[in-house]
Amino acid sequence: MMGNLQIEVVALEDAWQLLDIYRYYVENTAITFEYETPSLEEFKQRIITILKRYPYLVAKVDGQITGYVYASAFHERAAYDWCVETSIYLKPDCCHQGTGRILYQCLENILRLQHVTNMNACIASPVKPGPYLDDNSIRFHEHMGFQPVDKFHSCGYKFQSWFDMIWMEKMINDHQEKQLPLLRFDEVKKAVFDEKNRYQFKSEVTE
C-alpha cells in the first residue's frame, strides 16, 4: 500500500538517491544495457541536460523517493521534435504498487502540454527466460496504452546473455498539417506544479 504520494520535479540534491535506484538495475538486471553505473557528477549532468527541454519527475512516498520518470529526445534531427523516449525506474521494493502508473500519467499530461505527439519506449526483452530480465516492463507499457512497433533481435549483450529490444509507442496528441511548436518543460511547468515544484493532481490522474 502507498502512503502519502507526491510527484515532484527532480532536484539535483535528489541525484544520489536516483543513482542508487539506477545502480540496482545496472548491476543486477538487463533492463538497462549500461555495464557500469555512472558517477554522481555524470548522473547530475544527465538530469541537467534533460531538464533543459523535458520533464524529469520523482515520486515520494511519505517524503522518501521511490522512483523516477523522464522524457528525452527520441532523435537529434529537428523533424523528430514531437517524439520523445520515456524512461522509468522504481525502487525494487516499490514495484506493483501503482507508483509507476501515476508517474507515467503525470509525465504524459505534461508532454501533452508541450505538444509532444509520440511517446516511445525502448524496452529490453529476454531471448530466453533468465534471472536478469522478465516481461514486466512490456506488460506495464501495454497497460499504459502503448502498442508494440518493432523488435530488434539479439541486439544487446549483458551477463553473458543476449537480449532483444522492443520499441513501443503511444500517440498522445493529434498529428496536424501545421503542427504546434514544441514547448520547453519550463514553459508549461507552472500549469501543473505549485511553487514548491509539487505536481497538482487533476481529475485525470488518480491514485
Positions of predicted regions on the chain:
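Conserved acetyl-CoA-binding loop-helix of GNAT-fold acetyltransferases
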Residues: 96-112, 135-139
